[in-house]
């Protein structure tokens, strides 16, 4: 019976083929294909192949995760920091090539300790300081203050990095991105990091003491205290990024004090804007290390915000732009400043879109993109002040 059924099926296929050949002879372009001789096959609808999109662990939002929920971390690379700039590293190697090997290695490690291999942090600190200098001077600031505050930004940022690595010397080896830092990898000793901080802080204080007024000198003590406080804040509060914003933004009241010998309301409005700006980009930075921070027990706004990180970042970005809009209104800045804010809005939108899957590389790219945000705001401010 089974053979009869198979024979009938084959006969049915051949009869159907002959009928099609009569209606469409080969001369008319009809050609029998191999598929016409195959037996009909019934498909099971439940076994149809469905398109499946592979989602990696990095694409999943880290929502309310505990350290026990995370997979084991891969072994870190301690040869150099994972986020070091290749171009800056090559520049350092080129400048140190004439030194003896022992001196060259130690000097390179000290330069990496103070982040000379990664200047993006200094630029993010520089832009708000320049905002304040141009606003306080109502145009191009005096060269003396421009040089003092620009050099001071790099010096105090380097001092803060040395103190940060000293404070995190037990946490950094547990974080993949920071395990290659000189202090975490054992290439620099803790007392050398503290000595580096003291020397750089004294250089910064000497600049303020020699070239500014008494009010600026008083404010510099508060700035040094904030710079030393930030590295330890991540152990006791979920908002270390806010502390960083206050420390990074302290150059704003110092710039107003140096140029105007006062602290007008627009100064504190701009300071608030910088706290928001620093919280935005350092939260994006912390999103890169969120899993490692959970394992190490460190605190950050990225962990605090959880699955609401992107909506909260969007709110902070909108609040920052509104704050800068108020600054422009008080300073009577014209349309070029508004254009700068418009470009900053587009850059913020790109950051949120790029981070939608919360991948490490995307979050780090968004963090670096804030250098352009600070630059376009400053450029709009400069042009608007020049047109007054």
What does each model-identified segment do?
Residues 40-112:
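Transit-peptide-like, low-complexity N-terminal presequences
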Residues 91-108, 161-188, 283-306, 354-362:
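Cytosolic, membrane-interface loops and tails of multi-pass inner-membrane proteins
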Residues 108, 322, 326-388:
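Extended hydrophobic alpha-helices typical of membrane-associated regions
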Residues 124-131, 244-257, 304, 368-381:
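Small-residue-rich segments of transmembrane alpha-helices in multi-pass membrane proteins
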Residues 125-126, 148-153, 169-220, 295-335, ...:
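Multi-pass membrane catalytic core of lipid/isoprenoid biosynthesis enzymes
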Residues 129-130, 134-167, 177, 201-206, ...:
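Membrane-embedded alpha-helical segments that form the functional core of polytopic membrane enzymes
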